[in-house]
Amino acid sequence: EEYPNRLPDEQVVTFVPQNEEFRYGADDMIEFFSKNPVKTLLLINPDNPSGNFVPMEGVHKLAQWCEDNDMQFLLDESFVDFSVGFKNNTFLDNALLEKYPHMCVMKSISKSYGVPGLRLGIFCSADTALIARMKKQVSIWNINSFAQFFMQIYPKYREDYRVACEQFIQARED
Protein backbone atom coordinates (compact mmCIF):
# COMPACT_ATOMS: atom_id res chain seq x y z
CA GLU A 1 0.00 0.00 0.00
CA GLU A 2 2.85 2.42 0.76
CA TYR A 3 4.63 1.92 -2.56
CA PRO A 4 1.76 2.56 -5.01
CA ASN A 5 0.64 5.63 -3.06
CA ARG A 6 3.91 7.36 -4.00
CA LEU A 7 2.91 7.48 -7.68
CA PRO A 8 -0.09 8.82 -9.57
CA ASP A 9 -2.75 6.13 -10.09
CA GLU A 10 -2.21 6.08 -13.85
CA GLN A 11 1.42 5.01 -13.32
CA VAL A 12 0.56 2.02 -11.13
CA VAL A 13 -0.16 -1.38 -12.68
CA THR A 14 -1.33 -3.87 -10.06
CA PHE A 15 -1.01 -7.60 -10.46
CA VAL A 16 -3.86 -9.48 -8.75
CA PRO A 17 -3.65 -13.29 -8.72
CA GLN A 18 -6.69 -14.83 -10.36
CA ASN A 19 -7.28 -17.61 -7.84
CA GLU A 20 -8.96 -17.97 -4.46
CA GLU A 21 -5.70 -18.60 -2.61
CA PHE A 22 -4.00 -15.46 -4.01
CA ARG A 23 -1.00 -17.63 -4.93
CA TYR A 24 1.32 -16.74 -7.78
CA GLY A 25 4.78 -17.41 -9.09
CA ALA A 26 7.34 -15.85 -11.39
CA ASP A 27 5.67 -17.18 -14.53
CA ASP A 28 2.34 -15.59 -13.54
CA MET A 29 4.00 -12.22 -13.03
CA ILE A 30 6.02 -12.44 -16.25
CA GLU A 31 2.89 -13.32 -18.23
CA PHE A 32 0.95 -10.41 -16.70
CA PHE A 33 3.67 -7.78 -17.04
CA SER A 34 4.51 -8.89 -20.57
CA LYS A 35 1.00 -7.74 -21.45
CA ASN A 36 1.04 -4.76 -19.05
CA PRO A 37 4.54 -3.25 -19.31
CA VAL A 38 6.01 -1.22 -16.46
CA LYS A 39 9.32 0.58 -15.86
CA THR A 40 9.74 -0.92 -12.41
CA LEU A 41 8.56 -4.28 -11.12
CA LEU A 42 8.03 -4.55 -7.36
CA LEU A 43 7.91 -7.92 -5.64
CA ILE A 44 7.23 -8.12 -1.92
CA ASN A 45 8.50 -11.56 -0.97
CA PRO A 46 6.94 -13.02 1.06
CA ASP A 47 3.89 -10.97 0.31
CA ASN A 48 2.03 -9.22 3.07
CA PRO A 49 -0.76 -10.00 3.89
CA SER A 50 -1.22 -13.15 1.77
CA GLY A 51 2.11 -14.75 2.73
CA ASN A 52 2.66 -15.86 -0.88
CA PHE A 53 6.32 -16.71 -1.36
CA VAL A 54 8.18 -16.88 -4.67
CA PRO A 55 11.10 -19.32 -4.23
CA MET A 56 14.66 -18.27 -5.09
CA GLU A 57 14.60 -19.84 -8.55
CA GLY A 58 11.47 -17.82 -9.34
CA VAL A 59 13.06 -14.60 -8.10
CA HIS A 60 16.14 -15.35 -10.23
CA LYS A 61 13.80 -15.81 -13.21
CA LEU A 62 12.08 -12.47 -12.52
CA ALA A 63 15.42 -10.72 -12.03
CA GLN A 64 16.75 -12.06 -15.32
CA TRP A 65 13.51 -11.16 -17.11
CA CYS A 66 13.82 -7.60 -15.78
CA GLU A 67 17.44 -7.46 -16.97
CA ASP A 68 16.44 -8.73 -20.41
CA ASN A 69 13.68 -6.11 -20.62
CA ASP A 70 15.71 -3.18 -19.19
CA MET A 71 13.31 -2.95 -16.26
CA GLN A 72 14.11 -1.94 -12.67
CA PHE A 73 13.38 -4.76 -10.21
CA LEU A 74 12.58 -3.84 -6.61
CA LEU A 75 12.60 -6.77 -4.24
CA ASP A 76 11.21 -6.11 -0.77
CA GLU A 77 12.46 -8.80 1.60
CA SER A 78 11.02 -7.29 4.79
CA PHE A 79 9.39 -10.58 5.79
CA VAL A 80 11.88 -13.06 4.28
CA ASP A 81 13.06 -14.04 7.77
CA PHE A 82 9.69 -15.74 8.24
CA SER A 83 10.09 -18.01 5.19
CA VAL A 84 11.12 -21.66 5.37
CA GLY A 85 14.89 -21.81 4.88
CA PHE A 86 15.08 -18.03 5.26
CA LYS A 87 18.88 -17.92 5.39
CA ASN A 88 18.95 -19.16 1.78
CA ASN A 89 16.08 -16.97 0.53
CA THR A 90 17.70 -13.55 0.41
CA PHE A 91 19.23 -11.55 -2.40
CA LEU A 92 21.20 -9.44 0.07
CA ASP A 93 24.39 -10.76 -1.47
CA ASN A 94 26.95 -8.76 -3.44
CA ALA A 95 27.42 -11.48 -6.08
CA LEU A 96 23.66 -11.62 -6.75
CA LEU A 97 23.36 -7.85 -6.87
CA GLU A 98 26.27 -7.68 -9.32
CA LYS A 99 24.63 -10.36 -11.46
CA TYR A 100 21.40 -8.35 -11.66
CA PRO A 101 22.33 -4.64 -11.86
CA HIS A 102 18.67 -3.63 -12.40
CA MET A 103 17.79 -5.15 -9.01
CA CYS A 104 17.37 -3.27 -5.76
CA VAL A 105 16.76 -5.16 -2.53
CA MET A 106 14.99 -3.56 0.41
CA LYS A 107 14.39 -4.88 3.88
CA SER A 108 12.62 -3.25 6.78
CA ILE A 109 14.45 -4.17 9.93
CA SER A 110 11.77 -2.38 11.92
CA LYS A 111 8.99 -4.75 10.83
CA SER A 112 10.70 -8.09 11.28
CA TYR A 113 12.26 -7.18 14.61
CA GLY A 114 9.06 -5.68 15.99
CA VAL A 115 10.38 -2.13 16.40
CA PRO A 116 8.33 -0.19 13.82
CA GLY A 117 8.88 3.22 15.39
CA LEU A 118 12.57 3.05 14.54
CA ARG A 119 11.96 3.28 10.77
CA LEU A 120 15.12 1.31 10.13
CA GLY A 121 15.87 -0.57 6.95
CA ILE A 122 18.33 -1.66 4.29
CA PHE A 123 18.52 -0.73 0.62
CA CYS A 124 21.08 -2.45 -1.60
CA SER A 125 21.93 -2.31 -5.28
CA ALA A 126 24.94 -2.73 -7.53
CA ASP A 127 23.78 0.40 -9.38
CA THR A 128 26.18 2.92 -7.83
CA ALA A 129 24.66 5.83 -9.76
CA LEU A 130 21.25 5.04 -8.25
CA ILE A 131 22.73 4.80 -4.76
CA ALA A 132 24.49 8.16 -5.26
CA ARG A 133 21.20 9.79 -6.36
CA MET A 134 19.40 8.35 -3.35
CA LYS A 135 22.07 9.54 -0.93
CA LYS A 136 21.52 13.08 -2.19
CA GLN A 137 17.80 12.78 -1.36
CA VAL A 138 18.05 11.60 2.25
CA SER A 139 18.73 13.87 5.17
CA ILE A 140 22.24 14.04 6.57
CA TRP A 141 21.12 12.53 9.88
CA ASN A 142 18.85 9.81 8.49
CA ILE A 143 19.04 7.49 11.49
CA ASN A 144 17.85 8.46 14.95
CA SER A 145 19.61 7.65 18.22
CA PHE A 146 17.11 4.91 19.15
CA ALA A 147 17.72 3.10 15.87
CA GLN A 148 21.46 3.54 16.25
CA PHE A 149 21.30 2.04 19.75
CA PHE A 150 19.22 -0.86 18.46
CA MET A 151 21.86 -1.64 15.84
CA GLN A 152 24.54 -1.57 18.55
CA ILE A 153 22.75 -4.15 20.71
CA TYR A 154 21.45 -6.27 17.81
CA PRO A 155 24.40 -8.74 17.80
CA LYS A 156 23.56 -9.67 21.39
CA TYR A 157 20.11 -10.90 20.29
CA ARG A 158 20.90 -12.29 16.82
CA GLU A 159 20.69 -15.95 17.87
CA ASP A 160 17.48 -15.37 19.87
CA TYR A 161 15.95 -13.77 16.78
CA ARG A 162 16.97 -16.70 14.56
CA VAL A 163 15.45 -19.20 17.00
CA ALA A 164 12.25 -17.14 17.27
CA CYS A 165 11.94 -17.06 13.46
CA GLU A 166 12.34 -20.83 13.27
CA GLN A 167 9.71 -21.29 16.01
CA PHE A 168 7.34 -18.99 14.16
CA ILE A 169 7.83 -20.94 10.93
CA GLN A 170 7.28 -24.25 12.72
CA ALA A 171 4.10 -22.99 14.41
CA ARG A 172 2.75 -21.83 11.05
CA GLU A 173 3.56 -25.20 9.46
CA ASP A 174 1.81 -27.16 12.27
Region spans (language model):
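Amphipathic alpha-helical repeat scaffolds
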Residues: N45-G51, N144
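Short, contiguous strand/loop micro-motifs
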Residues: V16, P49-S50, R162-V163
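Active-site pre-lysine segment of PLP-dependent enzymes
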Residues: R23-K35, P49-S112
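PLP-dependent aminotransferase class I/II
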Residues: E2, H102-D174
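PLP-dependent aminotransferase-like
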Residues: E1-L43
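Structural motif
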Residues: T40-I44, L74, I122-C124
